[in-house]
């Protein structure tokens, strides 16, 4: 019997290592599959870039695709291909940073010690959605990538860094609406224990 396995998205796309001319898009699937991002200046996504993946936990794979030759301070739209074009992520956007010589102002979000607290297990989700996203949308713009340049989380992202499911359920899932549009810069603390 031939069984078909459908690739599932385990961690929604998130952005890292933004430069004026490039952006890294990462995500995780439960099985091995290709690493493809469709992207463009407009929602019809005229470009496609292939990256690579590596083993994470069990059969899961972390995918990384570097989008290059981008223009500084420019909005791009993207989505990831899940499996072999079986499905797609939602459509997201990001804005590349301006050239450093422009000395443009920018806003960041910095928060630390976001690990789950058993007495208040939904606090990180509340901070992301009720705090950051709602506040930024009301004060600056509904377009998060236009309003924020980066998210900095210096330490203690999860309680136990060696626990695979804490990363998935306690960090990436609550932050996914923000991390898919604004580059994430985590710094490991003592709770991550060199994970």
Label each residue range with its predicted role.
Residues 7-188, 192-195:
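Divalent metal-dependent phosphoesterase catalytic cores across multiple superfamilies
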């Amino acid at each position: 019997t031939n069984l078909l396995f459908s690739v599932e998205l385990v961690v929604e796309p998130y952005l890292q290592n933004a430069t004026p001319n490039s952006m890294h898009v990462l995500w995780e699937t439960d099985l091995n599959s290709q690493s493809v991002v469709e992207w463009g200046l407009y929602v019809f996504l005229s470009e496609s870039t292939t990256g690579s993946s590596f083993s994470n936990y069990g059969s899961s794979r972390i995918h990384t695709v570097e989008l290059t030759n981008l223009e500084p301070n420019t909005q791009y739209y993207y989505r990831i291909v899940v499996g072999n074009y079986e499905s797609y992520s939602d459509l997201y956007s990001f804005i590349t940073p301006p050239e450093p010589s422009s000395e443009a102002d920018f806003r960041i979000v910095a928060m630390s010690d976001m690990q789950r607290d058993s007495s208040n297990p939904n606090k990180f989700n509340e901070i992301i959605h009720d705090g950051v996203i709602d506040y930024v949308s009301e004060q600056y713009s509904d377009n998060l990538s236009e309003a924020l340049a980066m998210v900095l989380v210096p330490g203690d992202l999860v309680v136990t860094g060696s626990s695979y499911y804490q990363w998935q359920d306690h960090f990436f899932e609550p932050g996914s609406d923000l991390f898919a549009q604004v580059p994430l810069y985590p710094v490991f603390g003592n709770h991550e224990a060199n994970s």
